[in-house]
């Protein structure tokens, strides 16, 4: 328990003030007429300090659930935040982690072309769209 908490605060302040002033005076020339002001200033400065707060904990960078290289597999893509496997990450990132794809890439230092969809799933969607004729010019009707 500290001296401040046990009620020895006034004695401690006087002792600290005396130590500080003695150290200062031993290394500096101080006129006798200024000594009272110096003691008063040091004592009031010490009185205005609060109980020391513990230093803020250093925030460590979050480690990914899996390595970036292993996160993209043919059939699935793994979320670096939680380790879940998905065909598409975009909705999961917004609903569970409140991150846009851009924020996710920035947070994990991923390249801008890092996929948000598993490669096999993207290929299947592309193949299906081509079979449906999407992306082709429409033929004019007879008329």
From Swiss-Prot:
One of its GO terms (biological process) is regulation of DNA-templated transcription. It comes from the Bacteria. A zinc finger (C2H3-type) spans 79-97. GO terms for molecular function: DNA binding; zinc ion binding. The keyword DNA-binding applies. InterPro entries: ROS/MUCR_sf (IPR041920), ROS_MUCR (IPR008807). Keywords: DNA-binding, Metal-binding, Nodulation, Transcription, Transcription regulation, Zinc, Zinc-finger. Belongs to the ros/MucR family. This is Transcriptional regulatory protein RosR. It comes from Rhizobium etli (strain ATCC 51251 / DSM 11541 / JCM 21823 / NBRC 15573 / CFN 42). The lineage of its organism: Bacteria, Pseudomonadati, Pseudomonadota, Alphaproteobacteria, Hyphomicrobiales.
């Amino acid at each position: 328990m500290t001296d401040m908490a046990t009620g020895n605060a006034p004695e401690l302040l006087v002792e600290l003030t005396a130590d500080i002033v003695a150290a200062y005076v031993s290394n500096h020339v101080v006129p006798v007429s200024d000594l009272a002001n110096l003691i008063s200033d040091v004592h009031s400065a010490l009185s205005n300090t609060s109980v020391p707060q513990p230093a803020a904990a250093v925030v460590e960078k979050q480690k990914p659930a899996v390595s970036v290289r292993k996160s993209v597999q043919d059939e699935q893509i793994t979320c670096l935040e939680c380790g879940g496997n998905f065909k598409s990450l975009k909705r999961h990132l917004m609903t569970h982690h409140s991150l846009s794809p851009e924020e996710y890439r920035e947070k994990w230092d991923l390249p801008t072309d890092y996929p948000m969809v598993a490669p096999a799933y993207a290929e299947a969607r592309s193949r299906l769209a081509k079979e449906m004729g999407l992306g082709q010019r429409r033929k004019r009707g007879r008329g």
